[in-house]
Every structure is written in structure tokens, then in C-alpha cells.
Regions:
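Activation/maturation switch segments at domain boundaries
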Residues: 1-121, 125, 208-212, 216-363
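Structured, charged N-terminal subsegments at the starts of enzyme catalytic cores
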Residues: 92-208
Length: 363
């Protein structure tokens, strides 16, 4: 295993740890939102029901002024909290024409909207940090230290919120999933009332869909979008000095045929396209990639030329502290041409270091 392969594995492990913490935060929020919705449904049964059943025709009466005001206040609170999503709220004039069932259905939509807004914020923050990690892992492997980049908007915009899949970014997919789930929940709600379901039965059915779908949709996005950000951010530092790559799937019993077969192909870095020849290839994909160099001697000569032409000139590249000096001594060049003055590498030494870190000595 090369140094770079090992670092990619460490990045995956770090991402998985962050994902686990993110999932816990989302689960806590989802549970709290359903608890609030549950209380609203219970209040409907208490106010409009008899013997634990609500007559459907009673739900077709106009929404009360009090409930209408509460719904509008909730919409206003949401727009203030998430101004970037305010345009997704229903037109206020339509609220005045709602019946009781529609009022409760709007509450379901608002619950899902709150979940979508929170999920967006949490996933974006996770991806921002992951993009910084990915860039720094790549820069470290090229000899520029472990914390070359700090988080800033210019960096984040390259990777986070990019519409790489079907012309949509992760935020759009969250809202699409939200609207779809709200429609299903509202259909369940209306059909449950029409059947004369008891409060317990209605809430039980809603909870099953609510909990299962919200979590599944969010987890799929976290996993897949994380793979995109990891792959793209780690690739960025390599674009200047390398031209080819191949994909690197986790080869186990869960590896799909797409990822397993794709690993045999070599692609141009400039022609990479997520979902086509670069990770992720599908939902839940966690492929990575590795650099391909056909002729390392030729690459080293080109590296020296691009970085001033003097192989013995001082380089800005630094050796990772855990790599021993003897690991980067070239087999076919004089050690004096590669050696170090304190921690300073020559240009040739930098090239040999990068070759070693990428596993070139193993080929």
C-alpha cells in the first residue's frame, strides 16, 4: 500500500466518523419534528374526533382563524430562518381557503420543510470540512504540508453544491425528496381519515414512512455526495503535474460490477466526469482513484523541467514527517543529488519523494 493509498483510507475513515456524528444529529432533529407533528394530529383527534375517530366530513370544514394564524406564523418563522428557501413556501392567499384537512397537510409540509432546511445546513457544513480535508490530503502527498488550505468560500464552491448529477446539486435533491415525501405523507393522512383510522393506527403508519424515508434519503445523499467531494477535492492538487488516473474500488463482496470493471480502465484527468468515468458511479458509491504514470523517469525529467530545470535547486516541497529519508533515495541517481539540507529538498528530491508517496517505487 502506497503512502497516498493509506492517506485516502484515512480520509475515508475520518469521513465515516463525521458521517456517524451527522446521522445522530439528523436523527435527533427528525424525531423532534415528528413529535411536534404527532402533537398536532393528537390535537385534531381531541378537537374534531369522537371515540378516537374523526368523521371525514368534519375535516372539510374551513380552518379556524387560530389555526390559520399559527400556520402563517410558522411559515414566517421558516422564511426568517431559511431566507434562501422562502420562495418554496405556499402563497399566503391560499391559506385563507384551506379546510381543516388541508391545514393539517400544510403542517406536514412545513415539518418536512424544516427537516429539509436543517438537513441542508448540516450536510453543507459536513461537505465544507470534507472538501478542505481532501485538498489538504492531496497537497500533503505533493509535499506541501498537512494544512495548506483553510476553509474559504472560493474553495468550497469548487466542490460543495456542484450540480454534478442530472443537473442538480444536493440541495435541489433534498427539496425534491422533501416534496415527494410530503405528498406521500399527506396521501396517507387523507386516506387514514377516510378509512376512519384511530389515532394510534394513523400515527403508526405515518411514523413508519416518515422515519424510514427521511433517514434513507438523507443518508444516501451524505454518502454519495461525500464520495464526490472526496474524489474531486483530492484530485485538484494533482491536475498540474499528472495527466492520467484509474479508479480504485473497495474490492469485497459488496463491490458492484460497475466499480469492479471500471478499475481496469485508465482515463485522462482532464476528461473525468463523475458518474461516467470518475467516482461516484452510483448512489452509495465510495470508490476512490489513483494516479497512473506510464514512465516515471520521463515524468521526473518533466517535473524538473517544469520547476526551473535545475535538479539540484532548492524546492518548496517538504517530506511528511513519518517518511524516512532513505525511502526517497533514487536507485539510479547519486544520493548527493537528492539529499537534504536540514529539511529542504532539491527539485529532483521532490520528484523522487512524490514518486515514492504515490507508489511509483512499487511498480
Amino acid at each position: 500500500m502506497s503512502y497516498w493509498t493509506d492517506r485516502q483510507e484515512q480520509l475515508k475513515q475520518s469521513a465515516e466518523k463525521s458521517e456517524a456524528a451527522l446521522k445522530k444529529r439528523l436523527e435527533k432533529f427528525y424525531d423532534a419534528e415528528f413529535k411536534r407533528l404527532n402533537k398536532e394530529i393528537a390535537a385534531y383527534y381531541q378537537t374534531y374526533g369522537y371515540d378516537n375517530v374523526i368523521e371525514y366530513r368534519r375535516l372539510l370544514q374551513s380552518l379556524s382563524d387560530e389555526d390559520r394564524t399559527l400556520l402563517m406564523e410558522r411559515m414566517d418563522d421558516f422564511a426568517e430562518k431559511y431566507p434562501q428557501y422562502a420562495n418554496l413556501m405556499p402563497v399566503r392567499e391560499s391559506i385563507y381557503r384551506l379546510d381543516r384537512l388541508q391545514g393539517l397537510q400544510y403542517s406536514v409540509f412545513m415539518t418536512e420543510a424544516e427537516i429539509a432546511g436543517y438537513t441542508n445546513e448540516q450536510i453543507e457544513e459536513y461537505l465544507r470540512r470534507l472538501s478542505q480535508q481532501g485538498l489538504n490530503y492531496g497537497m500533503e502527498t505533493l509535499g506541501f504540508g498537512k494544512n495548506f488550505y483553510s476553509i474559504n468560500d472560493d474553495i468550497v464552491r469548487q466542490f460543495v453544491g456542484v450540480p454534478w448529477c442530472n443537473g442538480e446539486n444536493f440541495s435541489a435533491r433534498i427539496w425534491n425528496d422533501t416534496k415527494k415525501l410530503a405528498q406521500y405523507l399527506n396521501q396517507d393522512l387523507a386516506q387514514g381519515f377516510a378509512r376512519g383510522d384511530s389515532y394510534d393506527k394513523l400515527v403508526r403508519n405515518l411514523r413508519q414512512r416518515f422515519g424510514r424515508v427521511n433517514r434513507k434519503d438523507a443518508y444516501r445523499l451524505i454518502y454519495t455526495e461525500g464520495t464526490f467531494v472526496m474524489a474531486e477535492s483530492t484530485m485538484q492538487p494533482f491536475k498540474e503535474d499528472f495527466t492520467k488516473y484509474r479508479t480504485s474500488p473497495v474490492l469485497d463482496g459488496k463491490t458492484c460490477s460497475i466499480c469492479r470493471n471500471m478499475r481496469h480502465e485508465v482515463f485522462e484527468i482532464s476528461e473525468r466526469q463523475p458518474g461516467v468515468n470518475f467516482p461516484p458511479f452510483h448512489p452509495w458509491c465510495r470508490d476512490s482513484w489513483e494516479i497512473v504514470v506510464d514512465d516515471w523517469d520521463a515524468w521526473i525529467d518533466e517535473y524538473v523541467r517544469k520547476h526551473g530545470g535545475n535538479p539540484n535547486a532548492a524546492s518548496d516541497v517538504r517530506k511528511p514527517s513519518e517518511v524516512r529519508w532513505n525511502k526517497i533515495q533514487p536507485k539510479n541517481r547519486l544520493p548527493s543529488a537528492v539529499g537534504a539540507v536540514n529539511t529542504v529538498l532539491t527539485v529532483l528530491g521532490a520528484a523522487e519523494l512524490i514518486k515514492y508517496l504515490l507508489g511509483g517505487d512499487e511498480e
